[in-house]
Amino acid sequence: MISGLLVHRKRCPLVLCAAIVVGWSSAHAQTAPESPAQHLSPLEESTARAVDTHLADNLRLLEQIININSGTMHLPGVIAVKDVLAPRFQSLGFSVRWVPMQSQTQRAGDLIAEHPCPDGGGKCGNRILLIGHMDTVFEPQSPFQKFSIVPGTDGKVATGPGISDMKGGLIVMLAALGAMREAGALEHAEIRIVLSGDEERTGQPLELARKDMIDAARNSDVALEFEPGSRIGGNDTVSIGRRSSTTWHLETTGLSGHSSQIFGPRLGYGAIYEMVRILDAFRRELPQDGLTFSPGLVLGGSSAEMNAEATGGTAMGKANVIAANALAGGDIRTVSNQQTEQTESKMRLIVAAHLPQTDAKISFDEGYPAMAATTAGRELMQQWSDVSVALGLGPVAEAGIMTRGAGDIAFVAPYVSGLVGVGLLGEGAHAEGEKGYLDSLAPQAKRNAILMERLTLPLKLRRK
């Protein structure tokens, strides 16, 4: 239902257009664009003003939820963030429910909010799905725990755990919906929200962990993922694709004995040479566009054992003893699910070509699928860019799929078109010192709100 929704709007006076983007750099100023979609209607102007009106309150809310530790495995913290957000969605007219997941996936759960179309399901233009997550990679034992303004940035940049990935996106989402509500546009929209509590360390099995999100997508037309946006070369960008992420585990075995007999017919090559053969064959034979594969951990010796989290382990051996065991773990990232299948097949063939007197086996964990770029996705991105131009923020470019990792939107991509990275802009995600650009909160909220209005409201209401 995306195509054909770019409609004529009244030209906004340049003075008013400038007022909408208070504090935004003059470097983003636009000359008069030619597309009618690149102008704001009076309703859209009201929406943009509402974002600015409540900006200070939303910045305070951002600080509040950042200062709640919600590392994925700190379930009480994830639930505490949910307890802050849920009443705010309710105040906007959403019905809210919490789906606990502790017993099914050993994770906190999903927050689901729904705003029905008053005329009945599917009768308010495009049905929109907003997705995000409440957890971060920073567990309670991390020294990185609190929000703070970065000195020398005039209050425009802050640091804090999950500020860009993606607590900032949660506030962008609330700010956009709040502005739509204040302008009178939200009442005509059909919107579903699914916020997971385990995006950074997904619970298993995946069919349960992402069931709520997939079910919502089956009843939606467009998805917006509020993960962090990015600036490339000083320009704001958005993505329409994500790469997959699959973890692999490799084990090799060999016959142990005195090192003087290695390569001989009785003892053969040992487990470590078999491991090296396989990893080097991966390096030589697997490369193709869009594919990365990396061994992140290798253990080997007379004995080797990896811990349950696959983050370390123990290995024992001697310089003059042929290794009997070796273990490795790594990941694969692809631009399509077909590429994932082809890569796994090639890896299995490589593993099966053993050196003498060795054996090897490889397994793959259930992982994140890829989200391929589509024509419908590019049409949606163009509408996002048109909104940005209408706001005086300049066009938005596409950030290529190689700039993004895996994400939840890939689970819903078979059912909807979507945009990736419509949340708070920032840098350094997953690392201590992660930054968020506070001056991007209002622009991102305006882009989201007005795009949602254009996707859901009939023309006669948008022109009011």
What are these regions (language model features)?
Residues 13-23:
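Bacterial N-terminal signal peptides
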Residues 31, 35-161, 181-187:
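Acidic/His- and Gly-rich active-site-bordering loop/insert found
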Residues 130, 153-204, 246-252, 261-285, ...:
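Alpha-helical metal-binding/catalytic segments enriched in His/Glu/Asp
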Residues 157, 166-241, 303-310, 462-463:
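Acidic/histidine-rich catalytic neighborhood of metal-dependent amide-processing enzymes
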Residues 1-15:
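Bacterial N-terminal signal peptides that target proteins for export
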Residues 30-42, 70, 231, 240, ...:
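Metal-dependent amide/peptide-bond hydrolase catalytic core
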Residues 140-152, 241-244, 308-313:
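Short, flexible, mixed-charge acidic loops at enzyme active sites
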Residues 59-65, 82, 86, 174-177, ...:
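Extracytoplasmic/secreted envelope proteins and their assembly/folding machinery
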